[in-house]
């Protein structure tokens, strides 16, 4: 049932970008828990929420490989930023590489470490 529903929703959604498709593929190839990836439908939902709410800043705790951060950044307006915190330093290179390739990547600031330590330092 869920596969049919997911296929239906996917058929009505905007197609996944080449960049996000490549990130999905690399996440599945390079991580031991690729199911943690937000994915296309969840990413589009996050982007829609951001477009509707028009925040000036977003704090994401748990970057993983950056799919949700890229999705939310796509919905951010001019001058808005997204700070994303990831505790696993082994994921930094993969996430940052895709942030650097994205036209929205300049809106994203990746922080590596404990959210308990980093969040209070963010303005």
Where are the predicted features?
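A short glycine/serine-rich beta->alpha loop
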Residues: 31-36, 57-58
């Amino acid at each position: 049932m869920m596969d049919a529903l997911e296929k239906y929703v996917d058929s009505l959604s905007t197609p996944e970008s080449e960049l996000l498709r490549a990130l999905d593929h690399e996440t599945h190839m390079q991580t031991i828990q690729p199911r943690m990836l937000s994915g296309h439908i969840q990413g589009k939902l996050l982007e829609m929420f951001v477009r509707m709410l028009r925040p000036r800043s977003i704090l994401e705790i748990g970057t993983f490989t950056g799919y949700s951060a890229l999705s939310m950044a796509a919905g951010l307006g001019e001058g808005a930023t997204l700070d994303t915190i990831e505790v696993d330093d082994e994921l930094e290179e993969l996430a940052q590489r895709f942030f650097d390739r994205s036209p929205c990547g300049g809106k994203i600031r990746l922080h590596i470490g404990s959210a308990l330590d980093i969040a209070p330092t963010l303005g």
